[in-house]
Amino acid sequence: TRETYEAVTRRAGSWRAFTRGLDLLLDAGIKVRLKAMALRSNAHELDEISSFCRERTKDFYRFDPLLHLRFDGDPVRNEEIKAERLSPEEIVAIERADRTRFEALQNECEKGELVCPELEHQSCDHLFQCGAGVESFSVGYDGTFRLCSSLWHPGTTYDLRAGTLREAWEEWVPHVRDLRGAGAGFLERCRRCALVNLCLWCPAHAALETGAMDEWTEYFCDVAHARAAALLPDDMTP
């Protein structure tokens, strides 16, 4: 509804502007793909949001219940974000309620794409086990080069105004991807967790939550284990 949409955007008239813009795109024959964030402020309307989006999307719609904190570390805004986060149990409940999403997650678990038991024997201490900087990167409006759009931690970005794209890609990316973790949270938990793909944890998000790229994050961990308990047979749940 307009009320819920504008409670999230905090801008009067934004619902009308959004629907007008979307209608213009659709009327022009432009295919769109829609995504929504699942927040405490809109969780009561997720069914309606899903119906609205699926009627208009070119192929699929998804919602994301995992909120990371702000890149600038603003403490007031970060508390507002935390207040909008759903509990692990609420996240599982809304995923169960969306049959298409839940079945897709189950299928991916069965194929071994979301749960990786082999990681439990991981000995590598490289921080970046993800695809950041492997086939893509991000460049901000100010010329800041990042391995991914969420990676803002000091010492991981490159100023293209003071160097070249070739240097960033061929020299800086390998340097950042070679960084090692020394924190106990990373070494004893996250790097050896089979549920990493059910979790929001990564070096970039850990830095936003804790200030360190190799720290464990309780909320992410609780969500991952709650999702695993819902998706996996009892004998497969870590």
Cite the ranges covered by each PLM segment:
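Radical SAM enzyme [4Fe-4S]-AdoMet core and its adjacent flexible, acidic
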Residues: T1-D142, R146, S150-L160
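Flexible mid-to-C-terminal extensions adjoining Fe-S/redox cofactors in radical SAM and related proteins
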Residues: D125-L127, T144-F145, S150-P238
